[in-house]
């Protein structure tokens, strides 16, 4: 806090995340994850944690990484946008955004290196698998960063007005 760094609990456990809220003098963020109530992924976050983060002035950035999405690579834009609308109702439109977690144009060797046991002393495939250790395919509506307008369209189609949609797309930061 002293030097103004943002504390991000996207990769931390529930307990560590609550400790960060408790000890931080400033709001913290979950920069790239989704609610467990939408998809029970290892890295997605509980409703209680998201409420604590957002009620303390922090925010959540919704992840487009397939392992964090309901139906994985087959997740629809409508499903993703509906989850965002439900989250806006729960946590407030001013406390949510997009945290894509996309690894565009990265070779599978990058994710394989991350999982090779450097930190855990053993290979950890995360939500991948030994026989499919590379990056999962992105959903059809978000293959690359130039597809962000698809999300804006999805938010408007689900009922967000232009001001709300633009907040979610980045103005909330």
Describe the residue ranges of each PLM region:
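Histidine/acidic residue-rich metal-binding segments in metalloenzymes
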Residues: 1-29, 42-58, 78-94
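Conserved, mostly hydrophobic/aromatic
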Residues: 7, 32, 60, 101, ...
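Soluble non-cytosolic domains of exported or imported proteins
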Residues: 11, 74, 78, 142-146
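Active-site environment of divalent metal-dependent phosphoester hydrolases
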Residues: 12-18, 35-38, 66-70, 104-106
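A short alpha/beta connector and helix-capping loop motif
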Residues: 21-34, 115-123
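A conserved active-site cap/scaffold subdomain adjacent to cofactor or substrate pockets
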Residues: 54-77
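Short acidic/histidine-rich active-site segments
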Residues: 91-141
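Mid-to-C-terminal alpha-helical segments outside catalytic/metal-binding sites
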Residues: 131-173
């Amino acid at each position: 806090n002293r030097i103004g760094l943002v504390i991000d609990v996207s990769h931390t456990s529930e307990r560590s995340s609550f400790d960060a809220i408790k000890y931080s003098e400033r709001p913290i963020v979950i920069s790239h994850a989704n609610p467990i109530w939408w998809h029970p992924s290892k890295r997605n976050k509980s409703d209680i944690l998201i409420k604590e983060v957002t009620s303390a002035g922090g925010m959540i950035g919704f992840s487009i990484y397939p392992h964090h999405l309901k139906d994985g690579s087959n997740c629809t834009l409508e499903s993703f946008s509906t989850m965002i609308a439900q989250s806006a109702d729960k946590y407030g439109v001013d406390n949510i955004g997009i945290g894509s977690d996309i690894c565009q144009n990265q070779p599978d060797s990058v994710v394989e290196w991350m999982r090779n046991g450097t930190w855990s002393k053993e290979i950890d495939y995360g939500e991948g698998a030994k026989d499919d250790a590379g990056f999962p395919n992105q959903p059809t509506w978000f293959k690359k960063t130039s597809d962000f307008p698809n999300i804006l369209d999805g938010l408007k189609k689900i009922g967000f007005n232009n001001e709300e949609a633009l907040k979610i797309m980045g103005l909330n930061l």
